[in-house]
Amino acid sequence: MNYAYPDEKGHYGIYGGRYVPETLMQSVLELEEAYKEAMQDEAFQKELNHYLKTYVGRETPLYFAENMTKYCGGAKIYLKREDLNHTGAHKINNTIGQALLAVRMGKKKVVAETGAGQHGVATATVCALLGLECVIFMGEEDVRRQKLNVFRMELLGAKVESVAAGSGTLKDAVNEALRYWVSHVHDTHYIMGSVLGPHPFPQIVRDFQSVIGNETKKQYEALEGKLPEAVVACIGGGSNAMGMFYPFVHDEEVALYGVEAAGKGVHTEKHAATLTKGSVGVLHGSMMYLLQNEEGQIQEAHSISAGLDYPGVGPEHSLLKDIGRVSYHSITDDEALEAFQLLTKKEGIIPALESSHAVAYALKLAPKMKKDEGLVICLSGRGDKDVESIKRYMEEV
């Protein structure tokens, strides 16, 4: 399969690109240049690997979920344990890389957006480590849902700005963070949290997250002497999935499954299933599939999981859907909750609600596969942050 994206203009087929105001163009070009240089620099790679190993705690285990496998009665189920990273999710793979890039570019300050708070915490964490000033924008609805993470960020020295505009969720936080970056661009780096935004962000985030798929490949081959037959990951903006899928894109014998949030159901207004129900448009500097109405107004996305309710999806996922290399599915709030409880009870591992969507789809897929086949789930984060809202949800039900 001939797959080499993005092109030199930052396009993935028709998707991606740089739809930014003139005031930002210079900055994204400067970032692209700095990133290319860093990727060629052995000292930078060495420093990044040092922090990934000794600070983040990589490599993360590839765990054979024996009880889940028996329960499903089909393929062997493996979990790639990104929940065991420092700060409890895959987000730090990217923030540590981008923060080192910010230092390299001589920036003193970092701005970021956050939904569930995981990216915010991971950003505040690396800023504390590297002595960078940190400003985090978070929708007020998410601030309410994720009080603990807000407190964590503040403990780490970050300034958390609550965003009341729009629906008060991730999309609005990205808007404000981009605005802030425009006016502080001389001394500030924007750490985009997912494979979104203008080029080179989707590529940078994908490359820093690819450590997930690269490790998985190596670990699975060591255990089974072959590649897995299937790989499953959840998708909001799509960074854990892109990090898991990208190293497998050329291995066409490996089926790749992306799992979006169907919320209350894709037949309702309350979902975040962009690739299932969306259409093409431009948001936050990039062309991608979006949830929008006939007039092109962005619709509100809904999911029980704060990390999946983004109304768009990374441009590379948009392309991978069109060319059929990844098949995209969606899982409802209720199915995700069921999977959350099942994994907790069967394996003693409490997954994030985001990751529970991937687990839920794997539970449907595994029984249809043969016993000598393997299925890897990217367990993108731990569920500590969700226990409170799940308790509330279950009491209401």
UniProtKB/Swiss-Prot annotation:
EC number(s) reported in the record: 4.2.1.20
Signal is among the record's keywords: no
Residues recorded with modification N6-(pyridoxal phosphate)lysine: K91
Gene3D superfamilies tied to this protein: 3.40.50.1100
UniProt-listed PANTHER family: TRYPTOPHAN SYNTHASE (PTHR48077:SF3), TRYPTOPHAN SYNTHASE-RELATED (PTHR48077)
Quaternary structure, from the entry: Tetramer of two alpha and two beta chains.
Function field: The beta subunit is responsible for the synthesis of L-tryptophan from indole and L-serine.
Family per record: Belongs to the TrpB family.
Protein name: Tryptophan synthase beta chain
Originating species: Bacillus cereus (strain G9842)
Gene name as annotated: trpB
